[in-house]
Swiss-Prot record:
Matches recorded under InterPro entries: SurE (IPR030048), SurE-like_Pase/nucleotidase (IPR002828), SurE-like_sf (IPR036523)
SUPFAM superfamilies the record matches: SurE-like
Protein purpose: Nucleotidase that shows phosphatase activity on nucleoside 5'-monophosphates.
Subcellular location field: Cytoplasm
Alphabetic keyword roster: Cytoplasm, Hydrolase, Metal-binding, Nucleotide-binding
Membrane-crossing segments per the record: none
Gene: surE
Catalytic reaction list: a ribonucleoside 5'-phosphate + H2O = a ribonucleoside + phosphate
Family indicated by similarity: Belongs to the SurE nucleotidase family.
One matching Pfam family: SurE
The protein's name in its UniProt record: 5'-nucleotidase SurE
EC number of the protein: 3.1.3.5
Organism: Pseudomonas fluorescens (strain ATCC BAA-477 / NRRL B-23932 / Pf-5)
Origin superkingdom: Bacteria
C-alpha cells in the first residue's frame, strides 16, 4: 500500500507530520504538500507559472503551488511509483458544512478521487495542536478500514475530529453537511500611505447544525464522517428548471 499525503496548511505544518507518523508503519507514505499555507485554496490549479518540487531533509516534498497541484503532480508522474490512496490533513481548523467549498484540505482529497484513487480528508476542530494525537488516532483507524477502498465512484470522505482528548470522544457518526450563516463583512484596513485593503472575515456560525449534521456531531463529541461527491449536479431541480426553460426555447 502506497499513500500520498497532502494538506493545505503547508509542508511544515504539525498536522501533516502527525498524519505521516500515524500511517508510516502501516503503508509506504509520501508527503507532497504546498511550501506555504494555502488554506482556502479550494480546487485551484496553478497555470501561470511552472511548479517546482523540492525535497526537504525529512523526505517530504514541497511544491510552490496549491494542494490540488500537489496531488495532481503526485498522481501524474512525479513519483517513481503511483500511490494507491490519497489522505489529506490533518487540518488545524474545522472543515464543516460550507467550509468544504473553500477547503484546500478537502480539495486535495477530491483531486485524488478525480484521479481514481480512494481519498479521505481529516480536520481537527481547533487551531491548536493540543489534541492532535486524537485526530491522528482516528486518521489511522479510518485509513486502515477496508471500506475506504470500496467507496462508490467519485466519492470522498470528509472527517472532522472534535477538539477533545481521546478518552472523551463518544464515537463516530455518519453525517450530512450542515450550513453556515453568511460570513461577517470583510475588514477594511488602511496602510500608512492611505491605500485601502481588506481582510476576509471569519466564517459564519452554524445556521443548519441540527441532529444529523457534521456540526451537531462534533459538538456532541463525535467524530463526523461525511461522504462528498464530485458530481455537483442538483438532480431534484430538473423538473422545475425544465418548465422554466421550456418558455425560453
Amino acid at each position: 500500500m502506497r499513500i500520498l499525503i497532502s494538506n493545505d496548511d503547508g509542508v511544515t505544518a504539525p498536522g501533516i507530520a502527525a498524519l505521516h507518523a500515524a500511517l508510516a508503519d502501516y503503508a509506504e507514505c509520501v508527503v507532497i504538500a504546498p511550501d506555504q499555507d494555502k488554506s482556502g485554496a479550494s480546487s485551484s490549479l496553478t497555470l501561470d507559472r511552472p511548479l517546482h518540487p523540492h525535497t526537504l531533509g525529512n523526505g517530504f516534498i514541497s511544491i510552490n503551488g496549491t494542494p490540488t497541484d500537489c496531488v495532481h503532480l503526485g498522481l501524474n508522474g512525479l513519483l517513481e511509483h503511483d500511490p494507491d490512496m490519497v489522505v489529506s490533513g490533518i487540518n488545524l481548523g474545522a472543515n464543516l458544512g460550507d467550509d468544504v467549498l473553500y477547503s484546500g484540505t478537502v480539495a486535495a482529497a477530491l483531486e485524488g478521487r478525480f484521479l481514481q484513487r480512494p481519498a479521505i480528508a481529516f480536520s481537527l476542530v481547533s487551531r491548536q495542536v493540543e489534541n492532535l494525537a486524537t485526530a491522528a488516532y482516528f486518521a489511522r483507524k479510518l485509513v486502515q478500514a477496508q471500506g475506504l477502498l470500496d467507496l462508490p465512484p467519485r466519492t470522498v470522505l470528509n472527517v472532522n475530529i472534535p477538539n477533545l482528548p481521546l478518552d472523551h470522544i463518544r464515537g463516530i457518526q455518519l453525517t450530512r453537511l450542515g450550513h453556515r450563516a453568511r460570513a461577517a463583512a470583510p475588514m477594511k484596513v488602511v496602510d500608512p500611505r492611505g491605500k485601502a485593503g481588506y481582510w476576509i472575515a471569519a466564517a459564519g456560525d452554524a445556521e443548519d447544525g441540527g441532529p444529523g449534521t457534521d456540526f451537531h456531531a462534533v459538538m456532541q463529541g463525535y467524530v463526523s464522517v461525511t461522504p462528498l461527491q464530485l458530481d455537483r449536479t442538483f438532480n431534484d431541480a430538473f423538473r422545475s428548471l425544465d418548465g422554466w426553460l421550456e418558455g425560453l426555447r
